[in-house]
Amino acid sequence: MFQRTKTLLAGLAASTMLTAAAFAGELIINTDTSDPAPKKAFEEVIAGFEAENPDIKVTWNLFDHEGYKTSIRNFLTADAPDLANWYAGNRMLPYVNAGLFEAVDDVWEENGLNESLASAKGSMTIDGKIWGVPYTYYQWGVYYRKDLFEANNIAVPKNWDEFKAAGETLKAAGITPITIGTKYLWTAGGVFDYLNLRTNGYEFHMALTRGEIAWTDDRVRATMANWKELLDAGFFLENHAAFSWQEALAPMVQGEAAMYVMGNFAVAPLREAGLTDDQLGFFQFPMINSDVPMAEEAPTDTIHLTANGKNKENGKKFLAYLARADVQTQINETMGQLPINKNSSVGDDKFLQAGYEMLSNTDGGIAQFFDRDAPAEMAKAGMEGFQEFMVKPERLDKILERLEKVRMRINK
């Protein structure tokens, strides 16, 4: 654990009154932003906050990821900081339900965040209250070989029929429509998320991952039926269960596959493998159900006011600072990700620009990712089931029955 503290002013404890004032000027922040880019971003944001608030002494406790996951419930209960980082959506739910996070609707109201952070408001809301401030996310969607589309006269598909037609054209040209590597399961979770969001919408998807809807529900079956259309048409890379997500990049680089449902972190290795920005493009996962608003997948990092922290007002002051457009621009420039504040700016990278435009205009909700939105046991069973379905779609009934047993056990 790394600790950063601002040196106390000389003679601060000289009087009881000054000591009381010093206590009022403290702020303790716990995070697991220990990778180089997030660590640098937090160093910068804390330095900026201190420069604007010289009367507040910031103590920053930095954990490694695994240590943080095992420690967070304990320190929120027994030795709470004022602020702690976590994730949006259902990942907040255990700490909200346990009374360990505090609602910050007032911070949003007083700082115009209902408008400037509107795209992420749904993922920050539980039981009608807002439980933190989001500061970074990155998009998922469809990354594709523009040159292969152009060579086969394929326009970017906007809806399900156009998407399937594009796949058929690619297959006829001897090109695998969609590459994927499901060896480590989570990539199949991303495909399920988008199919379910497009078929049934954000509210249904979140209720399903919370365990409130049966896996044998007809609406889940409708999602799986849409997936089966792609499987029956042979759209996915053969033997995908043997490949990692990185290994599945190779067919796309070699021109043997045209699309990948993936997060923006795939761009760097695709470029490093030799694809140019003239060859590589991005589009929003197409509409399936026109009655369903277009929700997106964008894992979101957040900061939360703790219920047991001692310096509530200073915590709220930091949250307001963190939400500012200029601050989110700076953080995400350092991290190479996207600001949530719609008044922030992004650099010249075309994929960041495309993601920022898409997410800033999203009104259907922001999902986090299957293994963030579902409890760990359900996420593991679900992603195992998705991979199995992609290999053996005829086992659908058994897979859904198995997932329903897991849901019932978790929620009994």
Give residue spans per PLM region.
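Conserved C-terminal helix/tail region of periplasmic/extracytoplasmic solute-binding proteins
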Residues: 51-52, 57, 150, 329, ...
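Hinge/lid segment of periplasmic solute-binding proteins
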Residues: 87-140, 164, 191-193, 219, ...
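Extracytoplasmic/periplasmic solute-binding protein
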Residues: 127, 131-135, 140, 164-213, ...
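Glycine-centered hinge/linker elements that transmit conformational signals in sensory
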Residues: 167-169, 210-240
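Short, solvent-exposed loop/beta-turn-alpha elements that line the ligand-binding surface or hinge
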Residues: 102-116, 182, 199-222, 272-275, ...
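A structural signal for short loop-to-beta-strand junctions that line the ligand-binding cleft
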Residues: 81-82, 112-148, 176-180, 292-295, ...
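Extracytoplasmic "Venus flytrap"/periplasmic binding protein-like
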Residues: 44-116, 123-125, 147-158, 258-259, ...
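Extracytoplasmic/periplasmic substrate-recognition and gating elements
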Residues: 47, 51-52, 152, 225, ...
